[in-house]
Amino acid sequence: LDRLFRNLLTDSAGNMHLAEISIDKLWNFDSPSGLQGLIELRAFETMPDVADQSLAALFVRAVVSMLAQEPITGDLVRHGARLHDRYMLPAGLWEDLGEICHDLRAVGLPFEREWLRSIFEIRFPVLGRLSLPRGEVVVRQALEPWPLMAEMNGGGSTSRMVDNSTDRLEIALPDANVLGDGQVVVHGVGLRFREMGGQLVAGVRYKAAAGWPALHPHVPIQSPLRIEVLDAQERLVARARYFYWNPEGPRYEGAPRTLDEAKARRKARWRPDAASGEPPRRPVPASHCEESYYTLDLRRQPGAE
């Protein structure tokens, strides 16, 4: 198994030990500690309390037990670009969790998706809401993979940096009738919503900071992100700004000391604005990108304001 998977189960730099599924301690004769029969799952973040941490462990044990009873023998699904599109969005992952829990129940393991709700809310918090007469528009944090940059020489050593200048949000309509004939516009570009898990969802990827090195150093910072709701006559009915970082200055004074302080910082980065008295505006239609079916990438939108 070690010889079969060692060149496949690595991180993006080829490191076996830092892979999300690490087998360098399973049956590795090249290391004095490599014959322990261990498989490490390294992609789990530490939960804030014992209950959620135990729940994550229970979920993993349930999946392992299911696979022991019913090994998967079919062909693997080639997800392609969907891994960095659909499955970066909370709605896509929540729907996928539902399918896994359905498979668990099918083999006699009664694991309910709602048990994972608290972990889901920790990982994908609601950043803000826009209230409308028919309901609300919900904005959540989404996942954003940060690419590894080329080698950089400095001080006699070579290192590779990560481009952390981009961020991704999910904008969801829990009720398909919330907008009526209106639309949601981000930085002047109209969003295209897709049905997912019983709601309409769109991802938004944007340049959040001026990091270096970066894949797109020429793209200006697109924070604060301006989110607007227009009616059928393209009149502004609701809007808010979301700041990626401290809206009052260049940086925060250290990490938050308490959970309440962290929540207060997040709340302050969502700024609803008055929407009355604005003249009609015409949003720019989003340009098509095959690898971003669910996500609007503002870096690639020439008409973005």
Q: Where do the protein language model's features map onto the residues?
A:
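C-terminal accessory/tail domains of diverse enzymes
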Residues: 1-305
